[in-house]
A protein has these predicted regions:
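Conserved C-terminal portion of the radical SAM core fold
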Residues: 128-189, 199-219
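Canonical Radical SAM [4Fe-4S] cluster-binding loop centered on the CxxxCxxC motif
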Residues: 1-31
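Non-catalytic positions within long, well-ordered alpha-helices that form the structural scaffold/packing
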Residues: 40-43, 98, 166-170
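Short Fe-S-cluster ligation motifs
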Residues: 34-55
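Terminal RNA-binding accessory module
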Residues: 220-290
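Radical SAM/AdoMet-radical enzyme domain recognition
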Residues: 46-49, 61-149, 155, 162
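A short acidic, helix-capping loop that chelates divalent metal ions and anchors anionic groups
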Residues: 18-21, 114-120, 185-190
Length: 290
C-alpha cells in the first residue's frame, strides 16, 4: 500500500500529508501472498528473504500481522523483514509480529535530536518512544537502523545514531547499522543535492575510524536465481487494456499477459490501446502511446 503518517522532507516517492499523488492503492493480502508463492515456485530455491515495504509507512497496512504470518508458512522463506519509520511500533505490535514470524525490523531513524527529527519528518516525531521501541524490539529480533545521510541537514546526527546503536548492543540488543546515501528522484522530494558514492563511502570510512565500527553493511545472503521471463521487451508494440488511473498525474495503468504496464501522459480512460514498451528493466514495464 501507499500512504504515510509522516511527511519526510527527503521522501523519494512523495508520500505523506503534502503528497501530490492523485491516487492511493492498497493491495489485498491474498493477492500479495498468492503472487509471491507463484514467483517462488518458479524460482525453485530456498533461503528467501521477504522484505515487506511499500510507498509509505508499512505498518499502516491493516493486515500486516496476518501478512507476515502467511508469508512465514511458505517453506522456502527464511528471513522476513519490514521497513518502517518506527512511529507506529508498540510493544504489543512487536510481540505480535515476532509471534507471526517476523525476523527483522529495518527502522529509518534519521536523527536523535528532537527538533531535527521533527524537521526531517515534517511532523511531530516522538523520538524517545521510537528509541524505546528500538530497544524493546532488539531483544526479540534483529533491528537494522537505516538512517538516510542528508548532506547539510543530519550529518552530525549520524554520529549520535551510531553511538545509540552501540549502547543497545552493550545492553544485549541485536542492532546493526545500514546508513543510506540520499539520492535525488525525479518524482520525489529533494531538499539538497546528492553527493557521489565516492564521497559517501569516504564519509563512512571517516565515521568508522571515529567510532571503531564497521559501517559498510552488506547482505551476505545475496545469490542469483532464475529471472522471471518477460512477456514483452523494450521496443515491442503491444495492445494493452486500461484498468485504472496511476499514481502520477495523467498516468494510466494497463494490463497484458498478466503484467501491469504504466502509461504516462495517457488521457484515454478505458479500453484497449496500442503502446510501445520503453522500459522493461526488472520486469517493470512502461509504455508510451503509439
Amino acid at each position: 500500500m501507499n500512504g504515510c503518517n509522516l511527511d519526510c522532507i527527503y521522501c523519494s516517492v512523495d508520500e505523506g500529508f503534502s503528497s501530490k499523488r492523485p491516487v492511493d492503492f492498497i493491495i489485498e493480502r491474498d493477492y500479495l501472498v498468492n503472487e509471491f508463492r507463484k514467483l517462488l515456485e518458479f524460482k525453485n530455491t530456498t533461503n528467501i528473504h521477504a522484505n515487506i515495504a511499500g510507498q509509505g509507512e508499512t505498518l499502516m497496512y491493516p493486515e500486516i500481522v496476518e501478512l507476515v504470518r502467511e508469508i512465514r508458512q511458505i517453506h522456502s522463506v527464511d528471513i522476513i523483514s519490514i521497513i518502517t519509520n518506527g512511529t507506529m511500533l508498540t510493544e504489543l505490535l512487536i510481540d505480535k509480529l515476532v509471534s507471526a514470524g517476523l525476523t527483522r525490523l529495518n527502522i529509518s531513524l534519521n536523527a536523535i535530536d528532537k527538533g531535527l527529527a521533527d524537521k526531517i519528518a515534517n511532523k511531530p516525531y516522538n523520538i524517545e518512544k521510537v528509541k524505546e521501541m528500538i530497544r524493546y524490539a532488539s531483544k526479540r529480533l534483529q533491528v537494522i537502523l537505516v538512517p538516510v545521510l542528508i548532506p547539510g541537514i543530519n550529518d552530525a546526527e549520524i554520529d549520535k545514531i551510531i553511538e545509540f546503536s552501540k549502547s543497545i548492543c552493550m545492553e544485549g540488543g541485536n542492532v546493526k547499522l545500514g546508513i543510506q546515501n540520499f539520492l535525488s528522484y525525479r518524482f520525489g522530494r529533494n531538499p539538497v543535492n546528492e553527493i557521489s558514492w565516492g564521497e559517501f563511502y569516504e564519509r563512512l570510512a571517516g565515521l568508522e575510524k571515529v567510532h571503531n565500527i564497521n559501517l559498510k553493511y552488506s547482505e551476505e545472503r545475496l545469490f542469483e536465481s532464475k529471472e522471471l521471463p518477460k512477456p514483452f521487451k523494450k521496443g515491442w508494440s503491444i495492445v494493452v487494456k486500461i484498468i485504472c488511473d496511476g499514481r502520477l498525474k495523467n498516468e494510466k495503468l494497463a494490463v497484458s499477459c498478466g503484467r501491469v504496464i504504466s502509461i504516462p501522459n495517457c488521457h484515454k480512460e478505458k479500453g484497449d490501446i496500442k503502446v510501445k514498451i520503453v522500459r522493461d528493466k526488472h520486469n517493470i514495464f512502461v509504455g508510451v502511446l503509439k
